[in-house]
């Protein structure tokens, strides 16, 4: 059995100076720009183009495209999540906000009851604002928007109300990275921490496993824009994330070469990129020995060690 390589040094914190933290969206709120952005975002729902699928349906009239979401966002759950990255969960948890439905079609999705079957409750902007404020009252370190790409207008609506109610937590955009340029433009100056989960670099793999051949092009373009907006991840003196980019990547069986391509892209973006190489893949949803035999197994230790070797060889050093 191969000996595991030495793990990279602990993530190097780009530590923010002392003083009170102010989330980015407060400046937009004071100028009135946050409400204007929310109104502009809602206009995108008339012929929906929130994500690269650009379905063109009128969601304001409850027409449904790929994400099968109409005017209101549906919330599956919201709670203080202690299982996220340590820089997000801290001691009191990350204020996770799980939205129902999704704009992708991952055949291996482990949350298909939420993403495909739509488990959740349609919620108004006012109700979502109350949820955000409750998470703040419970002591959560941030508001963590999980699978948000198809409900950006609804998030902005709710955020504008929550800020008026006293919300002061950093905003985490926890996305599959399948976002449109228009959505990201509206989020510039709103989001503090972008956390894209970059899945595939090869269009053929994206088509087979996500039902989105254009995913790699759209995702890498989105990640580059996210980095332009917020830069490398910065933490406070307690190690809590305050601003910047944190990238997730799910290591999958037999697809090490694709992982290497993604890591190479991220190193080209910045060698200070904070990365979490996820190893919890397991066959789920539509994956079986008959349907997708090539990914019908867990990731091996050898595959993970090889991914770490490549990570180090690129000069990357911030590994969660």
Enumerate the predicted regions with their spans.
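Short glycine-enriched, charge-decorated loop/helix-capping segments at active-site entrances
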Residues: 113-119, 208-213, 290-298
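Structural detector of well-ordered beta-strand residues that form the stable sheet scaffold
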Residues: 172-174, 195, 246, 276
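Conserved Radical SAM active-site core
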Residues: 63, 67-189, 193, 203
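Anionic-ligand binding region
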Residues: 206-238
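Conserved radical SAM core fold
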Residues: 115, 152, 177-180, 198-216, ...
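Non-cysteine beta-strand/loop elements that form the S-adenosyl-L-methionine
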Residues: 188-203, 274-281
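Alpha-helix-loop-beta-strand connector modules within alpha/beta enzyme cores
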Residues: 158-170, 221-229, 301-307
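Auxiliary Fe-S-binding modules of radical SAM enzymes
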Residues: 1-63, 231-320
């Amino acid at each position: 059995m191969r000996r595991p390589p030495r793990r990279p040094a602990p993530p190097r914190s780009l530590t923010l100076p002392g003083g009170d933290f102010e989330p980015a969206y407060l400046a937009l709120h004071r100028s009135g720009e946050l409400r204007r952005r929310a109104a502009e975002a809602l206009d995108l729902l008339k012929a929906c183009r929130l994500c690269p699928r650009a379905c063109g349906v009128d969601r304001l009239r409850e027409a449904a495209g790929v994400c099968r979401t109409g005017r209101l966002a549906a919330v599956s759950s919201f709670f203080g999540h202690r299982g996220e990255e340590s820089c997000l969960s801290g001691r009191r948890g990350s204020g996770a906000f799980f939205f129902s439905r999704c704009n992708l079609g991952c055949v291996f999705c482990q949350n298909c009851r939420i993403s495909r079957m739509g488990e959740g409750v349609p919620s108004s902007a006012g109700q979502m604002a109350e949820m955000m404020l409750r998470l703040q009252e419970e002591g959560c370190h941030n508001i963590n928007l999980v699978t948000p790409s198809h409900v950006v207008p609804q998030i902005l609506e709710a955020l504008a109300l929550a800020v008026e109610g006293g919300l002061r937590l950093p905003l985490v955009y926890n996305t599959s990275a399948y976002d449109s340029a228009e959505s990201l433009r509206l989020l510039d100056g709103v989001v503090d921490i972008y956390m894209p989960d970059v899945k595939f670099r090869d269009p053929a793999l994206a088509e087979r496993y996500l039902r989105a051949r254009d995913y790699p092009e759209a995702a890498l373009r989105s990640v580059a824009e996210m980095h332009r907006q917020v830069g490398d991840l910065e933490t406070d003196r307690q190690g809590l994330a305050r601003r910047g980019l944190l990238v997730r990547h799910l290591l999958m069986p037999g697809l090490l070469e694709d992982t290497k391509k993604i890591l190479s892209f991220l190193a080209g973006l910045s060698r200070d990129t904070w990365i979490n190489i996820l190893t919890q893949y397991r066959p789920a949803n539509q994956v079986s020995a008959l349907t997708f035999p090539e990914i019908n197994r867990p990731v091996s230790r050898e595959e993970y060690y090889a991914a770490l070797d490549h990570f180090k060889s690129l000069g990357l050093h911030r590994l969660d």
